[in-house]
Amino acid sequence: SLIPHAINAVSAIAKHF
């Protein structure tokens, strides 16, 4: 699924910030 993958990417960005 692309949705969970997108959320994972956003989560990684949030942790980076």
From Swiss-Prot:
One of its GO terms (biological process) is defense response. Its main location: secreted. The modification Phenylalanine amide is found at F17. GO terms for cellular component: extracellular region. The keyword Flavoprotein does not apply. It is found in: Secreted. The keyword Metal-binding does not apply. It comes from the Eukaryota. Disulfide bonds: none annotated. Expressed by the skin glands. Keywords: Amidation, Amphibian defense peptide, Antimicrobial, Secreted. Belongs to the frog skin active peptide (FSAP) family. Phylloseptin subfamily. Has antimicrobial activity. This is Phyllospetin-H4. It comes from Pithecopus hypochondrialis (Orange-legged leaf frog). The gene is psn6.
